[in-house]
Amino acid sequence: MTEQTYLLMHRHINGYGRLFGGQLMQWIDELAGIVSMRHAGGRITTASIDNLNFKAGAYLNDTIVLIGRITYVGRTSMEVRVDTYVEDLEGMRRVINRAYVVMV
């Protein structure tokens, strides 16, 4: 399991005042890459991002937490689930996204 945390800044926000979906997709891909490289002990490539579900928005100055874990390992590929949360000042987290990334 790997966890990364980000503070949402103006450069991460779209024209509607929410986290830009493309930015979140980049963070998901990077985290899935780290998780799978640690498991494989070598280089990997993203094959696909499946089932990318946006459940809620995130806004300027929100703390974003991404948690990645391997859910399947095959002979030539693996699947990484990445859950994304907004964390409040008390440490409570609410899910805003879940994605499954296939790495080869």
Q: Could you say what each language-model-derived stretch is?
A:
Residues 2-4, 59-60, 71-104:
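HotDog/MaoC-like acyl-thioester-processing domains
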Residues 48-63, 69-75:
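Active-site beta-strand->loop segment that positions catalytic residues and contacts the acyl thioester
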